[in-house]
C-alpha cells in the first residue's frame, strides 16, 4: 500500500489495494507499532499545563494550526462540511465528537474546522514519537491515553475538566485504526469504552463522518471530501453510566454508517484474505 503523505499525489492503482485478515489490521504503522513497542508518557507529563506561558504558547500554536488546517481542508482537499448548524444545540455545554478514521492528516485538521470551539483529541502515546509533529501534538490539543494507573487518573481528570468546566470539544476515533480512504465504518474495537466520558459527565455526543467523491479537477484521481456532522445524541438520565455507554455507542455507530452512505468513490480497495483451509 502507498505511503500516506501530507500532500498526497495521485497514487498508482496497483498501490491502492490492501489485503487484510481482520478489521484491526493496520495499513499504516509507525516504527513503534512495527516493533510492538509500548510507549510511555514523558516523566512529569502535564495534561493541563500549569504555566501561563505554556498555555499562551498552546493557544498561539492552535491558532496557527487552525489557519493552516483551514487552507489544507478547503483548498487542498476541497472539503465541504455539512451539518455544522447542529452543533448550536450544544451551546452552554461541552461535547464529544466521534469520527471515522480514514486519513492520518485530514483526521488531525478536519475536526478543528468541524467543531465550533477548541478541540482536544484523544491520541495514542505512540503518536508522540511521530517525526516533527509528534512533540507538538499536546500543544495543539492532543490528549495521549494514560499508560500507568496515575497517568490514567490524570487523563480522566483532565478530560472531565475540558468537558465540564471549560465546555470544550473532545474528539475520539472509536475505530482506532487508520484505513486510508475507507468508505465503510468498522465496529469499534473497544466497544463502548470511549463513551464513558460523555456518559459520566452527562454531555451530548456528535459524529463526524468523512466521505470521498471524485475530484472536479479533470484527470485527478485523488478524491475530494465531504464531511457530515450528525447529532446531538444525549445520555438518558434514567439509565446508568454503563447503560448510557452502550446506548451512545450504538447511536454513534448507526449515525456514522448512515452518513457513510454519502460515499460515491472508492479510491482505495480493501480485500479480505481468504481463510486458509
Spans of model-derived segments:
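Membrane-anchoring hydrophobic helices of lipid-metabolizing enzymes
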Residues: 2-96, 106-110, 275-277
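Catalytic core of membrane glycerolipid acyltransferases/transacylases, capturing the structured
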Residues: 89-149
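Non-catalytic C-terminal accessory region of glycerolipid acyltransferases
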Residues: 2-39, 156-277
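Conserved beta-strand scaffold positions in the cores of enzyme catalytic domains, especially
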Residues: 81, 121, 142-144, 205, ...
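Short, flexible active-site-adjacent loop segments at beta-strand->alpha-helix junctions, enriched
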Residues: 85, 101-103, 110, 176-177, ...
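Glycine-rich anion/phosphate-binding loops
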Residues: 149-155
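Short amphipathic alpha-helical segments and helix-helix/interface helices
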Residues: 69, 111-112, 134, 160, ...
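Short, glycine/acidic-rich beta->alpha junctions
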Residues: 103, 151, 186-190
